[in-house]
C-alpha cells in the first residue's frame, strides 16, 4: 500500500507562494504535512533554494525553515531552482525582474535555512543541482537518498557549507550559465 508522500513545499514564505501561484498558504502546507504524518505516512518535503532569488532569499530561507520545523517531516529534500524556458520565472529572469543568486549566495541561503532548522528527520541533497564543489574537487554533500540525520549531523552539514564557501566560486555549478546555454 501507499506509505510515503512526496510534497513540493517549494517555500514556506507566503509572499513567494503568491508570486509563484502555488495555490496554498504556509499554514495550509503545515496543516497538510501534519495530517499526512498523523495518518502514518512517511513524509518527504521538497524545498527550492533560490526560489526567492536575490531579492527574497532571506525571507525564503527563514520562512521555509519555520514551516519545516512545524511539520518536522521524515525527509527534507533540496531541489535548487533552475528556471526553465517557457515558464514565467524564466521570463522574469530574462527580463531582469528576477535575479538568480550566485553559487556562494545560494550556499549562504542554505546556511541560514539549515541554521534555523530544528527537526528530527533527514536532510537530503540527492539531486544533481546540489552539486556544489568541495575543496577536494568532488561534490560538497553526499547525494544519496538518506542524506544527513538531524539534529545529529546538522553541525557536519554546516561545516560542509562553510567549506563550500571557501572554494573559489568559479569551481561551483553556476545556474545562470546553465540557463544561458539552454542546457536544461
Regions from the language model: what does each represent?
Residues 1-41, 49-71, 92-104:
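Conserved non-cysteine loop/helix-boundary elements of the Radical SAM core domain that shape
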Residues 69-184:
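Auxiliary Fe-S-binding modules of radical SAM enzymes
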Residues 7-11, 45-49, 78-80, 125-127:
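A cross-domain feature marking catalytic cores of carbohydrate-active enzymes
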Amino acid at each position: 500500500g501507499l506509505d510515503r508522500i512526496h510534497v513540493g513545499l517549494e517555500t514556506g514564505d507566503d509572499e513567494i507562494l503568491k508570486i509563484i501561484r502555488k495555490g496554498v498558504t504556509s499554514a495550509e502546507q503545515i496543516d497538510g504535512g501534519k495530517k499526512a504524518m498523523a495518518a502514518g505516512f512517511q513524509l518527504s518535503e521538497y524545498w527550492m533554494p533560490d526560489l526567492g532569488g536575490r531579492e527574497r532569499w532571506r525571507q525564503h530561507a527563514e520562512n521555509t525553515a519555520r514551516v519545516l520545523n512545524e511539520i518536522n517531516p521524515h525527509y527534507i529534500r533540496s531541489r535548487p531552482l533552475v528556471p526553465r524556458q517557457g515558464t514565467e520565472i524564466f521570463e522574469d529572469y530574462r527580463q531582469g525582474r528576477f535575479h538568480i543568486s550566485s553559487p556562494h549566495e545560494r550556499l549562504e541561503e542554505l546556511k541560514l535555512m539549515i541554521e534555523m532548522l530544528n527537526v528530527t528527520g533527514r536532510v537530503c541533497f540527492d539531486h544533481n543541482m546540489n552539486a556544489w564543489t568541495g575543496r577536494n574537487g568532488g561534490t560538497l554533500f553526499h547525494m544519496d537518498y538518506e542524506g544527513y540525520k538531524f539534529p545529529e549531523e546538522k553541525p557536519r552539514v554546516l561545516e560542509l557549507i562553510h567549506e563550500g564557501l571557501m572554494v573559489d566560486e568559479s569551481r561551483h555549478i553556476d545556474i545562470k550559465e546553465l540557463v544561458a546555454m539552454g542546457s536544461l
